[in-house]
């Protein structure tokens, strides 16, 4: 018998492998989409918070927080807008000022937290001596100089609130490239007003 041979039929194991590969690609796409959504939300929120910083109103109609300061970190292309109240909900949208701390530049410790993989990812390159610019909503502008960088265990260490002079403390999760979120380690950058040096 001469002529073309019939194409072999796809065997069952090959179909199962194909289905498995398609499912794996769908799961991977969903994971990447979720990661992209987190970064997109963080970027969009900062744009809305910037508008609220200028106008004095809430960043969105249902918000129970307001921007209190603008923060410019070394090497950052854009300023970050800091929300009042260090809740997890606020941290999803931007850096947040701890409710128990003072406004930047006031006597006491101003503690601002942010996520290591979005707003505070640039803290990984921070060095002692770097300058951090802060502008409060009331127009006061303060330049801080990084005095110390530490990694602490949040289960054991507590941040002092009752310091006798203005101090800025930036806090984020550590290590910066951690695979699992919510570990106990925190990267803590302590800064003092440049005018006091």
Describe the predicted segments one by one.
Residues 1-14:
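N-terminal Lys/Arg-rich, disordered targeting/topogenic segments
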Residues 13-197:
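Solvent-exposed, non-transmembrane regions of membrane-associated and secreted proteins
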């Amino acid at each position: 018998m001469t002529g073309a041979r019939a194409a072999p039929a796809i065997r069952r194991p090959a179909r199962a492998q194909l289905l498995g590969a398609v499912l794996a690609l769908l799961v991977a796409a969903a994971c990447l989409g979720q990661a992209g959504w987190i970064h997109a939300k963080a970027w969009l929120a900062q744009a809305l918070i910037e508008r609220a910083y200028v106008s004095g109103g809430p960043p969105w109609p249902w918000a129970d927080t307001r921007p209190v300061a603008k923060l410019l970190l070394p090497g950052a292309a854009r300023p970050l807008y800091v929300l009042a109240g260090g809740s997890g909900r606020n941290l999803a949208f931007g850096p947040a000022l701890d409710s128990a701390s003072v406004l930047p530049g006031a006597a006491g410790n101003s503690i601002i937290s942010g996520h290591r993989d979005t707003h505070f990812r640039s803290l990984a390159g921070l060095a002692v001596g770097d300058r951090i610019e802060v502008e409060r909503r009331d127009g006061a502008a303060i330049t801080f100089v990084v005095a110390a960088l530490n990694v602490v265990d949040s289960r054991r260490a507590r941040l002092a609130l009752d310091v006798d002079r203005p101090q800025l403390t930036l806090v984020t999760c550590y290590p910066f490239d951690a695979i699992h979120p919510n570990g106990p380690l925190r990267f803590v950058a302590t800064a003092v007003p440049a005018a006091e040096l």
